[in-house]
Swiss-Prot record:
Residues 540-565 are annotated as: Disordered. The gene is treA. It catalyses: alpha,alpha-trehalose + H2O = alpha-D-glucose + beta-D-glucose. GO terms for cellular component: periplasmic space. It is an enzyme of class 3 (hydrolase). Substrate binds at residues 152, 159-160, 196, 205-207, 277-279, 310, 511. Residues 548-565 have a biased composition (Polar residues). This is Periplasmic trehalase. Its main location: periplasm. HAMAP family: Peripl_trehalase. It comes from Shigella flexneri serotype 5b (strain 8401). GO terms for biological process: cellular hyperosmotic response; trehalose catabolic process. Its EC number is 3.2.1.28.
Length: 565
């Protein structure tokens, strides 16, 4: 869906011709990929809608993950014949015709384990193998074993996996890191991109693009051979994110690509479908109905696109933080996504050079440099003194500070003076007793205050360290690890998100109960333990006292979270 073209021709951004040709070649390849599996809402039509609306299961994801026992067309035909008969029982019909997902066995860790021992013991518990799946299963098969987040998340998730892999590498499980990279490469080869997760209902979108960073991580162990091996898949993923760029005029958007009036190319989150999400069917329908002033399809796409961002949901995407139906993800250019695209271009340049293609390496460097200029021009709020998202409707950078603002530092795309301002903004507005706040807004959504998420803690920590802001970085790690340790001491588990307004409490909000496991928290915790403890004295639990800054420690903000951005 393109926005209207401007009335007069605009100057085209300089994009190397060979990159355009490469996009064209990959689009032909994409047309040759196998027919993708259909999601359950399409396979089962009115039956799927009726089951979800009947709320037979507390979690809408349960039926989305159910496996038909026979051809869905036959099940649907039987349903149409039986549904109006006297005494028809929908729950009985579902139980007869579907195999419901099994609840995972409750893991009881051995007593007396340290935090590190607990995490190391969880890796095999969270490992799954689905080389073969049932014919009509929404679960997509993968050739190698993989680590899932835990809880209701029975499949592998794209951006979660990078932070999980950091922990696997820290534990010495390079074989598992290699397996997961191979799985994601398989998805790119099979579907043309990495879906949100390995479910048919996730195929219409991706997630924050960390594949190139995964390959770079693997290269720490295998050297440039990993970069050369996965260069074709990295190029194909890049083409997916840039699909449609060759036909864009200034001021237009196409799928995941945005071309601003001066020709600057940036990216946004996008889902190819504009229907309710099968895993949150009833919730999405209710959200759309609650705002009759907007087309339901527009709201559905913005809900789906927010899921593609990983931040589902957050005031970051909304006009009114208290009303989810005002979200408009597709009209926002995210600072974190474009930072990751910059990093992808830099890694593509490095991989191309390793493969002996210096000309292509130079082209990717040109693209990375152009994107870096775009980030500095459009995704920096000079008045506020922090990085932020760009609003395509108002044609202005937004004012809200979020933890996503640390991504330019994480990928080394930030100017030094701006990184220093980000350090000040972070400790003034986001740092709390239990770690880094996601935003300063209390909306009831899970990607808002008072929740803190492991991946954002690590991005901030690494990003600030990249620019010499070690004290703030160490404080973030220290406060978050203390939160993780206190929760573990009380409950003997690591969880998906934490309440950072205090320590020792899991986070709340969102569409489902708090999940434990938890892949990315495990990975980030291991990285942070090795960061705050000296190599000559590694620690298995979080030390009782701050290990680095003994005095003049940065004090976390004690300001009450504000109700509006």
């Amino acid at each position: 869906m393109k926005s209207p073209a401007p009335s007069r021709p605009q100057k085209m951004a300089l994009i190397p011709a060979c990159i355009f040709l490469y996009f064209a070649a990959l689009s032909v390849q994409a047309e040759e990929t196998p027919v993708t599996p259909q999601p359950p809402d399409i396979l089962l039509g009115p039956l799927f809608n009726d089951v979800q609306n009947a709320k037979l299961f507390p979690d809408q994801k349960t039926f989305a993950d159910a496996v038909p026992n026979s051809d869905p067309l036959m099940i649907l035909a039987d349903y149409r014949m039986q549904q109006n008969q006297s005494g028809f029982d929908l729950r009985h019909f579902v139980n007869v015709n579907f195999t419901l997902p099994k609840e995972g066995e409750k893991y009881v860790p051995p007593e007396g384990q340290s935090l590190r021992e607990h995490i190391d013991g969880l890796w095999p518990v969270l490992t799954r193998s689905t080389e073969n799946t049932e014919k009509w299963d929404s679960l997509l098969p993968l050739p190698e074993p993989y680590v899932v987040p835990g809880g209701r998340f029975r499949e592998v998730y794209y951006w979660d996996s990078y932070f999980t892999m950091l922990g696997l590498a820290e534990s010495g499980h390079w074989d598992k890191v290699a397996d997961m990279v191979a799985n994601f490469a398989h998805e790119i080869n099979t579907y043309g991109h990495i879906p949100n997760g390995n479910r048919s209902y996730y195929l219409s979108r991706s997630q924050p693009p960390f594949f190139a960073l995964m390959v770079e991580l693997l290269a720490q162990h295998e050297g440039d051979a990993a970069l050369k091996q996965y260069l074709p898949q990295m190029q194909k993923e890049y083409a997916y994110w840039m699909d449609g760029v060759e036909n864009l005029q200034a001021g237009q958007q196409e799928k995941r690509v945005v071309k601003l009036q001066d020709g600057t190319l940036l990216n946004r989150y996008w889902d190819d479908r504009d229907t309710p999400r099968p895993e949150s069917w009833v919730e999405d329908i209710a959200t759309a109905k609650s705002n009759p002033n907007r087309p339901a399809t527009e709201i559905y796409r913005d809900l789906r696109s927010a899921a593609a961002s990983g931040w589902d949901f957050s005031s970051r995407w909304m006009d009114n933080p208290q009303q989810l139906n005002t979200l408009r993800t597709t009209s926002i250019v995210p600072v974190d996504l474009n930072s990751l695209m910059f990093k992808m271009e830099k890694i593509l340049a490095r991989a191309s050079k390793a493969a002996g293609d210096n000309a292509m390496a130079n082209q990717y460097e040109t693209l990375a440099n152009a994107r870096q200029k775009g980030i500095e021009k459009y995704l920096w709020n000079d008045q506020q003194g922090w990085y932020a998202d760009y609003d395509l409707k108002s044609h202005k950078v937004r004012n809200q500070l979020t933890a996503a603002a640390l991504f330019p530092l994480y990928v080394n795309a930030a100017a030094k003076d701006r990184a220093n301002k980000m350090a000040t903004a972070t400790k003034t507005h986001l740092l709390q007793p239990g770690g880094l706040n996601t935003t300063s807004v209390k909306s009831g959504q899970q990607w808002d205050a008072p929740n803190g998420w492991a991946p954002l803690q690590w991005v901030a920590t690494e990003g600030l360290q990249n620019y010499g802001q070690k004290e703030v970085a160490m404080d973030i790690s220290w406060h978050f690890l203390t939160n993780v340790q206190h929760t573990y001491d009380r409950e003997k588990k690591l969880v998906e998100k934490y309440d950072v307004s205090t320590t020792g409490t899991g986070g709340g909000g969102g569409e489902y109960p708090l999940q434990d496991g938890f892949g990315w928290t495990n990975g980030v915790t291991l990285k942070m333990l090795d960061l705050i403890c000296p190599k000559e004295q590694p620690c298995d639990n979080v030390p009782a006292t701050h290990p680095t800054v003994k005095s003049a420690t940065t004090q976390p903000s004690t300001k009450e979270a504000q109700p509006t951005p």
